[in-house]
Every structure is written in C-alpha cells, then in structure tokens.
C-alpha cells in the first residue's frame, strides 16, 4: 500500500432511501468496522447528524457505494447515491469516491449471520456490514469513480 494511503481514516456509506450503512476503517492496519445504521428520509440524511459523525471520526477519505445493475448500467438509486456523494464532498471538502457495490449485500448478509452468532448484531445491520465490505474491497483494489 502506498505510504500516502497508509495513514488514511476511511468512512464508507452504503446509501439507501430509508437507511444508510456506515463503516469506518483505518488503512494502516486495513481495518473496517460497521457502525450503527443511519436513518434516511426518502434518501436524504439529517446533514447535521451526519456531519457530527464525520467530525467524531475525522475521516480523510469517503467511499460511497455505487449501486450498479449486473449489466453495468445505472439505476435511479445510482443517481441518488451520486448526488449524496457530491453533496457529502461539498459539505466536507473530503475526497470522495464511488465504489461498485454489487454483490456486497449478499456477502454482508453472510457476515451478519456471523455477527449474530457472536451476539454482536444488535445495532449492526447488513447495510453497515456492506459499507465495511466497501472499505475491504478498497484495500484490495483502491479504485473508484468520481461522483
């Protein structure tokens, strides 16, 4: 991993219209931890609350899941996720990348079962685990597209 990436604190978002998964990761140790679900109102976050979370964790990079169809086409949800990512970048001036989130939901559900077996799933949902998986995929291949 390039040295410039090793000190990054990464925050990832699995965008949704009713709720959004959030995770935080530390690039130096390639960690990723799902956080509690964030409520959304028709795809719009409470920006004051979201910015409090950002201030608390002080990320240096944002990843926002890009919900693509299996044929690589974008959907209405893709456009809304891009809009969220652009506004997030504008509100914070933090570098923001869109990352392909296909297949993370299925993987996240499997991971959630593991959390439930360990009794750690009270506030964690598949959406937050999906955000955590976005960070893990970034560690393996740090590539994305501009919002």
Curated annotation (Swiss-Prot):
Gene3D superfamilies: YqgF/RNase H-like domain
GO cellular component, one term: cytosol
Source domain of life: Bacteria
Gene Ontology biological-process entries: rRNA 5'-end processing
Localization, UniProt: Cytoplasm
Coiled-coil intervals, chain numbering: none
SUPFAM superfamilies from the UniProt entry: Ribonuclease H-like
EC id: 3.1.-.-
Annotated InterPro entries: RNaseH-like_sf, YqgF, YqgF/RNaseH-like_dom, YqgF/RNaseH-like_dom_sf
Stored Pfam families: RuvX
UniProt KW keywords: Cytoplasm, Hydrolase, Nuclease, Ribosome biogenesis
Listed GO MF terms: nuclease activity
Protein family per UniProt: Belongs to the YqgF nuclease family.
Role noted for this protein: Could be a nuclease involved in processing of the 5'-end of pre-16S rRNA.
PANTHER family per UniProt: POLYNUCLEOTIDYL TRANSFERASE, RIBONUCLEASE H-LIKE SUPERFAMILY PROTEIN
Record-given protein name: Putative pre-16S rRNA nuclease
Organism: Acinetobacter baylyi (strain ATCC 33305 / BD413 / ADP1)
């Amino acid at each position: 991993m390039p040295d410039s990436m090793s000190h990054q604190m990464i925050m990832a978002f699995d965008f949704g219209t009713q709720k959004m998964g959030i995770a935080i990761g530390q690039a130096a140790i390639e960690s990723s931890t799902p956080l509690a679900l964030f409520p959304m109102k028709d795809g719009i976050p409470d920006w004051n609350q979201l910015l409090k979370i950002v201030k608390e964790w002080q990320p240096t990079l944002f990843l926002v899941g890009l919900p693509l169809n299996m044929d690589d086409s974008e959907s209405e949800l893709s456009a809304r996720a891009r809009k969220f990512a652009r506004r997030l970048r504008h509100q914070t001036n933090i570098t923001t990348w869109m990352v392909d989130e296909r297949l993370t939901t299925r993987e996240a559900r499997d991971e959630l079962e593991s959390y439930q077996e360990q009794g750690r799933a009270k506030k964690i949902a598949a959406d937050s685990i999906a955000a955590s998986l976005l960070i893990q995929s970034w560690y393996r291949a740090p590539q994305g597209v501009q919002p």
